[in-house]
């Protein structure tokens, strides 16, 4: 028996758990981030949105909090609901993607500027030393990017 077959034999009983690990991590993270914004509207977030000139900051901040809790719960519950849960999981994954794109745009847009500038400017010297740029490190290693891509995974895959 080669090592690959041996590892397959060990992992086989746990293969059904793999998506649940991702589902529970993403769902719990979103639920906790959303609950942390209660009671509604979240005052600190409203003040921050006002400072950025966002229209109806109380409504937007409340929708973000409710969206986080709802998407997190739907990611988890969608896996338990069989075929009807497939659609719920995909919609929740899409909601996670939308929320995370908004979070990255509003709170972390400087990461993109740092990350993309060398490519846009065509500065080969800077491109070869990207790891020295703070935005590059945040962009690649951030929790936000992992949450975004986990949401994308569930939006594409659903319960399949």
Protein language model annotation of sequence segments:
Residues 1-40, 58-160:
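Extended, low-polarity transmembrane helix blocks
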């Amino acid at each position: 028996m080669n090592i690959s077959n041996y590892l397959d034999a060990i992992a086989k009983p746990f293969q059904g758990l793999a998506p649940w690990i991702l589902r529970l991590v993403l769902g719990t993270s979103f639920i906790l981030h959303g609950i942390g914004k209660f009671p509604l509207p979240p005052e600190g977030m409203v003040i921050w949105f006002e400072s950025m000139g966002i229209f109806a900051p109380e409504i937007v901040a409340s929708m973000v909090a409710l969206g986080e809790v709802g998407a997190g719960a739907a990611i988890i519950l969608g896996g338990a609901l069989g075929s009807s849960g497939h659609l719920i999981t995909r919609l929740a994954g899409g909601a996670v993607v939308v929320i995370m794109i908004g979070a990255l745009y509003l709170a972390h847009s400087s990461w993109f500027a740092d990350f993309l500038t060398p490519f846009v400017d065509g500065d080969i010297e800077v491109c070869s030393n990207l790891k020295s740029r703070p935005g590059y490190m945040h962009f690649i290693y951030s929790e936000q990017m992992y949450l975004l891509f986990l949401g994308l995974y569930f939006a594409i895959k659903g319960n399949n």
